[in-house]
Amino acid sequence: MIYLVEDDTNIRELVTYTLNHSGLDATGFERPSQFWKAMEQKLPDLVLLDIMLPEEDGLSILRRLRAAPATASIPILLVSAKNSEYDKVMGLDNGADDYLAKPYDLE
């Protein structure tokens, strides 16, 4: 199960569609509150996480996931339009497993 937290509807729908049609099980969330509700029901195998989100930024979500024993080891890939070296270092220093700058190729 892959969870994608992305507020851009076009990106969220394209990525979840592509992952699902590649044989993976992906669910997209527009808002962090939707993501947290789903996390109470089922933990994913991977989280794709935008940084700039409504309600709560991606780095805050990342820190919360890493601080909780039940979610600390879930792989997290930050996906963001913020692509400076500083942004990438901040993401990795806060516990992301990798950082992918938008726009990106789904292949």
What are these regions (language model features)?
Residues 8-27:
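Two-component/phosphorelay signaling modules centered on CheY-like receiver
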Residues 27-46:
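Acidic, metal-coordinating helix/loop segments flanking the phosphotransfer/catalytic sites
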Residues 43-45, 70-75:
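His-Asp phosphorelay/catalytic-motif detector in bacterial-type signaling
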Residues 50, 80:
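Active-site residues of response regulator receiver
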Residues 54, 84:
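The feature encodes the CheY-like receiver
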